[in-house]
UniProtKB/Swiss-Prot annotation:
Top-level enzyme category: oxidoreductase
InterPro entries registered for this protein in UniProt: ChlB/BchB/BchZ (IPR050152), Nase/OxRdtase_comp1 (IPR000510)
Enzyme Commission no: 1.3.7.7
Organism: Equisetum arvense (Field horsetail)
Name by which UniProt lists this protein: Light-independent protochlorophyllide reductase subunit B
Cofactor: how bound: Binds 1 [4Fe-4S] cluster per heterodimer. The cluster is bound at the heterodimer interface by residues from both subunits.
Length: 103
């Protein structure tokens, strides 16, 4: 959650964390989905991609390389819709550089 908040990403829903059936109606509102653990959520993400054209990210942001890859995938997905809805694009490279500079 903190990483996405640092990037200015609003989280729509976290499923299954504290979710109920009422929350499921919000799933198609997301620009993309994140599946940090393939064992949980991959089938749902595949369904949402197939039925709603909603992409998903499978990379788990653990370690420097995977975290940087994850952030770049977030950037790619955000920038597919941000120009239309927010009239701008995002570049997270400086965030990646700063976070990995002292490691």
């Amino acid at each position: 959650k903190r990483l996405l908040e640092d990037l200015g990403i609003k989280i729509n829903e976290i499923i299954p964390e504290g979710a109920s059936v009422k929350n499921l109606i919000n799933l198609p509102k997301a620009w993309f989905n994140i599946v940090p653990y393939r064992e949980v959520g991959l089938m749902t993400a595949s369904f949402l991609q197939k039925d709603f054209g909603m992409p998903y990210i499978l990379t788990t942001p653990m370690g420097i390389i995977d975290t940087a890859d994850f952030i770049r995938q977030v950037q790619k997905n955000v920038n597919k819709l941000a120009p239309f809805f927010l009239n701008k694009t995002f570049d997270y490279e400086s965030y990646i550089d700063y976070q990995t500079k002292f490691v």
